[in-house]
């Protein structure tokens, strides 16, 4: 071997170097190759304002694992990266930056402001991409896209104009969610609902012409009273049948409003009378449409009251509320105030309370657009993992409203609509139409609004591949295979990609959506700036390495479930990396200078066949788990195999043979060949999770290989199936564990070797122990081994160890307290009594017998038989000691 591993593993020595090697050699890049099957994942584009956080780290680690796995399986694997222009977030950042320079946005033209945005993007937009590289992400950076690059922008304009011509995009006055701080409309998906303590203000509305008669309404928002255009009651409510059609005096105004009957009103809720404010409530808006009510906007874009509020004009909405309530009380119209907890909509970005108000906005009509997206999940064309996400998905699609896509911002895709300066005629066109088709005027002004950021993101799976052009990339790599994303953006992005894929491409954009949960702190709290509990992934990488972070994020992680982050787990992952490194160094040191050849099956020892059989089964099991997207389960199996079976058992068993290269070269060769072969297989199985350390070790171990990344993923080999040897070595392991346990209990140091008697009535098992003494002679610290059918010739003071199928005896004579041994056996008996009770309880449970898989039931029956045998042996030993 021309190269050696350093004595200690330091991620800083290898990670940047290896990543540069991978990128320089184009290992991440994918081109159309019809001889290979494609596998495509599109990266959820991080915002250009973003910095790598734990959510990004988990999301991209999962994607990278799948891409590396499929690449090793021989697929033409494309991981399509890119970033999102993030209109609101970027605009806020740029405005802050300008403010620090003493510049106000209002002092700039639109073009000047956009220049500042592009400058900001150039300076900061690539930051998160560099951070994703530090994580080891093997995305095809040669194909990196941006949601506002020329190709993506063309796709956005194409979709907008197509949907407009189809009648599925329209402009109209509707209730929208208005953010008074960001001063833009936002979609329903961008509204979070927080439970807040508020009040019901009960207010009397005087009945016109009937002195002293009032209709009592209850409202949580008295300041919207100025926009009331009716009071509604349920037509079935007997209490109010006589006032339907009458007129009420609207308090604190000189207006009168009618009493109407509408089934929308819940007669059991509140007073059964509801103030109707069509311009400031989505439900009231619908009632207003049914009854042809006037829509009166009373709140300005900045959440101050307008002139319709009379003397309260100019006040903030909450100041108005307080002043109005005081005045209603003075007028004797405030009946009572009742505490009330209710959900309040807030903007998910700035957490300002959203103001529902009527605005002229652009909308996507959803009633027809959503149908294929619903059917695609129902018929299994698209699979959501975990399956419980189906309920969340359908809950949203069943209650979907038209999507408000216009935003009152400058940074983003400008709406391709043009208005005639003379007659106001509107034309939707990608290019400026030049002249008005109605009056011929040549002065056309573009709509000032931009599109919701998620409009362009919804096209991401196909716009990144060249759509609307019919490119070879699009034909080959679309549809994508898997989408990996957090469950928190199922409404923002996942559903919109699905219906956009069906509408524009005629097929689903991917066949599987793998959801992951949030990464929380060790106390289960969401990481946030306000709590100060955020953990920077780059800090973790700097301290422990990217591989340790990746392993920590995936181990024990189940699809859709939140996970807790513990520093102790990162340390454990780092310790695992050290163990892999040290084991590899030991193997390579012993291989150095030795001419290795492939041994015949007869030259392999039982332990060699056992570990080959184990890694063979691991390859099969891990592949099955990976194919089912059970990444956490797969890596746990790989981890356990490497740490336990390979390092703690096989290396220790084989170690003695590696020292006998001259004395027994055939045996040494078989051991060294097995060590190298199994380590190679294990490194490949570990590579998708821990790419850096596996690359460094693999390329040192297999110096003729370029990279582990393009090596073949391990497959199950029938010739490595050795069930008899597996069973034999497991018996030997039971023996070693039993002896080690009793030595620990008796405080007998490993250096003190003892004679070992193995008794078993099973002749086949006796043969196993006779033929495999080399496996356990050193691990059990024995001086002499005697295998026999019974305990003839064994001294009475010998300490016994009961293992499945056999009893071990260690004649420790005066080293062991006889009474202490009896105490130990009684403890063992108590332990077995509990296990027997548990096992019998399960096997007498009808629910378990009927619902559990047959193999599970059989497994429990086998356990019971084993416990019963062990109990008989313990009781026999106790009887002998009386």
Annotate each language-model stretch with its function.
Residues 1-54, 77, 335, 348, ...:
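Non-catalytic terminal extensions that flank enzyme cores
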Residues 3, 8, 17, 21-25, ...:
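Residue patterns forming the tRNA-binding/recognition surfaces of aminoacyl-tRNA synthetases
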Residues 31-94, 147, 156, 217-219, ...:
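N-terminal catalytic cores of NTP/NDP-binding nucleotidyl/phosphoryl-transfer enzymes
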Residues 34-36, 44-45, 80-91, 144-152, ...:
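Short, solvent-exposed turn/loop segments enriched in Gly/Ser/Thr/Pro and often Arg
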Residues 57-65, 215-251, 274-281, 291-298, ...:
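Extended active-site and interfacial segments that coordinate phosphate-rich ligands
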Residues 68-76, 97-110, 130, 134-139, ...:
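Secondary-structure transition/capping motifs at alpha-helix termini
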Residues 202, 395-455, 459, 503-546, ...:
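Feature 926 captures the class I aminoacyl-tRNA synthetase adenylation module centered on the KMSKS loop
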Residues 254-260, 448-478, 644, 648-651:
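Active-site-adjacent "gating/activation" loops or surface patches in catalytic cores
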């Amino acid at each position: 071997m021309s190269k050696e591993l350093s004595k200690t593993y330091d991620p800083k020595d290898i990670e940047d170097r290896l990543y540069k090697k991978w990128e320089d050699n184009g290992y991440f890049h994918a081109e159309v190759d019809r001889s290979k099957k494609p596998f495509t994942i599109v990266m959820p584009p991080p915002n250009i304002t973003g910095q790598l956080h734990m959510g990004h780290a988990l999301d991209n680690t999962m994607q990278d694992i799948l891409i590396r796995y499929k690449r090793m399986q021989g697929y033409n694997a494309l991981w399509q990266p890119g970033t999102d222009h993030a209109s609101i977030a970027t605009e806020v950042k740029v405005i802050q930056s300008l403010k620090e320079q003493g510049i106000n946005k209002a002092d700039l033209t639109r073009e000047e402001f956009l220049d500042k945005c592009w400058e900001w993007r150039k300076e900061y937009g690539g930051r998160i991409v560099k951070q994703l590289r530090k994580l080891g992400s093997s995305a095809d950076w040669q194909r990196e896209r941006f949601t506002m690059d020329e190709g993506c922008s063309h796709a956005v304009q194409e979709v907008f104009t197509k949907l407009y011509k189809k009648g599925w995009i329209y402009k109209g006055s509707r209730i929208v969610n208005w953010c008074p701080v960001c001063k833009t409309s936002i979609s329903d998906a961008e509204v979070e609902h927080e439970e807040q303590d508020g009040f019901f203000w009960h207010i009397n509305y005087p009945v016109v012409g009937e002195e002293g008669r009032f209709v009592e309404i209850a409202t949580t928002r008295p300041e919207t009273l100025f926009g009331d255009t009716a009071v509604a009651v349920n037509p079935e409510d007997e209490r109010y049948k006589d006032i339907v059609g009458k007129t009420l005096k609207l308090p604190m105004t000189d207006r009168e409003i009618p009493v109407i009957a509408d089934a929308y009103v819940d007669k059991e809720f509140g007073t059964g009378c509801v103030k109707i404010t069509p311009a400031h409530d989505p439900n009231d808006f619908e009632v207003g449409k049914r009854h042809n009510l006037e829509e009166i906007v009373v709140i300005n874009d900045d959440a101050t009251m307008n002139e319709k509020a009379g003397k309260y004009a100019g006040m903030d909405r909450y100041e108005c509320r307080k002043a109005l309530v005081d005045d209603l009380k003075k007028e004797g119209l405030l009946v009572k105030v009742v505490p009330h907890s209710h959900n309040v909509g807030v903007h998910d970005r700035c957490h300002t309370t959203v103001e529902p108000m009527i605005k002229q906005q652009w909308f996507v009509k959803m009633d027809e657009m959503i149908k294929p997206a619903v059917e695609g999940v129902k018929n299994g064309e698209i699979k959501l993992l975990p399956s419980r996400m189906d309920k969340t998905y359908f809950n949203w699609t069943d209650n979907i409203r038209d999507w408000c896509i216009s935003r009152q911002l400058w940074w983003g895709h400008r709406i391709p609509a043009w208005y005639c300066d003379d007659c106001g005629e509107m034309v939707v066109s990608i290019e400026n139409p030049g002249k008005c088709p109605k009056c011929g005027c040549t002065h056309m002004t573009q709509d000032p609004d931009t599109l919701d950021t998620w409009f362009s993101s919804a096209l991401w799976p196909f716009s990144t591949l060249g759509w609307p052009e019919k490119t070879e990339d699009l034909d080959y790599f679309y549809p994508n295979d898997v989408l990996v994303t957090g469950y928190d953006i199922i409404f923002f992005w996942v559903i919109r990609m699905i219906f956009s894929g069906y509408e524009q491409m005629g097929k689903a954009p991917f066949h599987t959506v793998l959801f992951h949960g949030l990464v929380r702190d060790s106390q289960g709290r969401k990481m946030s700036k306000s709590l100060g509990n955020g953990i920077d992934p780059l800090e973790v990488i700097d301290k422990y390495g990217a591989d340790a972070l990746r392993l920590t994020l995936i181990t024990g992680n189940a699809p859709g479930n939140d996970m807790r982050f513990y520093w102790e787990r990162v340390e454990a992952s780092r310790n695992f990396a050290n163990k892999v490194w040290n084991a590899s160094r030991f193997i390579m040191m012993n291989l150095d200078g030795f001419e290795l050849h492939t041994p015949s099956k007869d030259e392999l020892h039982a332990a060699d066949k056992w570990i080959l059989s184990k890694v063979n089964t691991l390859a099969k099991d891990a592949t099955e788990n990976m194919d089912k997207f059970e990444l956490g389960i797969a890596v746990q199996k790989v981890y356990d195999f490497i740490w336990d079976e390979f390092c703690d058992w096989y290396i220790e068993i084989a170690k003695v043979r590696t020292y006998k290269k001259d004395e027994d070269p055939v045996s040494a060769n078989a051991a060294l060949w097995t060590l190298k072969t199994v380590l190679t297989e294990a490194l490949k199985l570990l590579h998708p999770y821990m790419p850096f350390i596996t690359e460094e070790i693999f390329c040192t171990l297999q110096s003729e290989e370029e990279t582990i990344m393009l090596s073949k993923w391990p497959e199950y080999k029938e010739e490595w199936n050795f069930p008899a040897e597996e069973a034999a070595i497991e018996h030997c392991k039971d023996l070693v564990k039993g002896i080690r346990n009793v030595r620990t209990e008796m405080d007998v140091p490993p250096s003190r070797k003892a004679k070992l008697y193995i008794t078993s009535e099973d002749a086949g098992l006796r043969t196993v122990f006779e033929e495999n003494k080399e496996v356990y002679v050193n691990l059990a610290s024995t001086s002499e081994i005697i295998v026999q059918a019974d305990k003839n010739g064994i001294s009475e003071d010998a300490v016994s160890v009961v293992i499945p199928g056999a009893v071990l005896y260690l004649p420790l004579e005066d080293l062991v307290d006889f009474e202490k041994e009896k105490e130990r056996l009684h403890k063992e008996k108590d332990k077995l009594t509990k296990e027997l009770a548990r096992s019998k309880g399960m096997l007498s449970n009808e629910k378990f017998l009927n619902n559990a898989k047959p193999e599970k039931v059989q497994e429990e029956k086998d356990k019971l038989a084993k416990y019963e045998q062990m109990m008989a042996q313990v009781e026999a030993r106790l009887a002998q000691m009386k």
